[in-house]
Structures are given as structure tokens and as C-alpha cells.
Amino acid sequence: RQRTTETIVADGLAQLPAADAKVFNQVMGELAATGSKGVEMIAAMLVPADKGKNATFEYALNGVVAYVTDPAHEALRDDVRKGLLAAIDRCGDDANRAFLFSQLQFCSTAADAAAMARYLDDPYLAGYALRALVSTPGTEALLLAEAGKDDLTAARKQALAYAFAEKRLAAAEPFLLTWLEGADAQTAEQIYN
């Protein structure tokens, strides 16, 4: 039977929370198979905390991410990642965007690094973007390229110094040494740590 993405999402959400593991896996498999469109659709249902409850939608997105990070279902991962990235860009609520970033960090790849790095200067999302970049394998080249840019803010230097430490990136040492000259106390502390 041919069901639309809208129908699959509505049917899946109606079954949550799942009664047991079998139902959970079936629902998550169906939702994950809707790909980017389904993920974006569910993410669009998230509302600011003062406007309603997001538990079912967060449960669904978290479940889909967990489902596609299982090696048995990895073929569905790319479309889910793309949906999360698009949802982050479209979402207007910072807390919900932070939640979406927290999910992205479980399934992101190095191909997503530039999209995540765009948020490093966002006052609310910088920490979430940074954690996603740090937890994503293969982002070292992008982080080094970011460090080589002119006119980096102190906040950006602190974020990059943290990322370099977390990734144990020895190639970043020349940047860190250069940044120490004239660094404010917070930046110097992050570089030394």
C-alpha cells in the first residue's frame, strides 16, 4: 500500500510512546524510511516550551536517530542527517534547535562540518555546534581551516581551542601559540587547558 510521508508520520506519532521494543523498532523504521522529509516534518512540529509539549516529537526524533545509528540501519542515516540539518536551519526556537543539534551529533559526518561551523558564533547554539563538531569524526581539517581565518573573535578562539584539546589535535599548536599573544584571560585559560 502506498502511504504518503504525512500519513506515515501521523501514524507513527500516534503509536508513541511505543508499547514494546517490537512496536518501537517498527515505528522508528517507518519514520526513518521517510528520510529527510519525515524528519523535517516532525521537527517542524516542535514548539517553544511555553507554547506546548514536545515530548512525543522529541521521542520520535531521538528514536529515529538511535535507529539509523544502528549498523543494521545505517543506509537510512544520510537522509536523517540531511533532515536534521535542514530542520536546524528552519527552526525559529533556540531551545528546539539545540535539541536538534544534540540529535545531529549522534549521526553527523565530516560532510556536515561546514554546516555545523556556521553556528559557532551564535550566542545560544555555539556550544551545541561545537559539541557536534568535536563528536563527529573527520572534522579536524575544517577546525584547522577555521583557525587559519583572520579576525577570529575571542569566543571563536576559545571554542576552537576547546575542540583542539578534545580532539587532541597537535597540528593546532601553532595557532594556539599565536593566539596567546594578547589573549584575554578566558581565551588564555582555554588555550592552556
Task: Name each model feature, range by range.
Residues E30-A33, Y59-Y67, L100-F106, A132-S135, ...:
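Core register positions within helices of long alpha-helical scaffolds
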Residues R1-Q15, S36-P48, D70-D89, A98, ...:
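Amphipathic alpha-helical scaffolding segments comprising HEAT/armadillo-like alpha-solenoid repeats
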Residues K22-N25, G29, A33, F106, ...:
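Short, solvent-exposed linear motifs at loop/edge-of-secondary-structure regions
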Residues K51-V68, G127-A159, A185-N193:
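Long amphipathic alpha-helical scaffold regions
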Residues F24-Y59, G63-L76:
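Alpha-helical solenoid scaffolds in large eukaryotic transport, assembly, and signaling factors
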Residues A18-V23, G92, L152:
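Charged, low-complexity interaction regions
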Residues A21-F24, V39, K53-E58, R97, ...:
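Residue-level detector of extended alpha-helical repeat arrays and alpha-solenoid scaffolds
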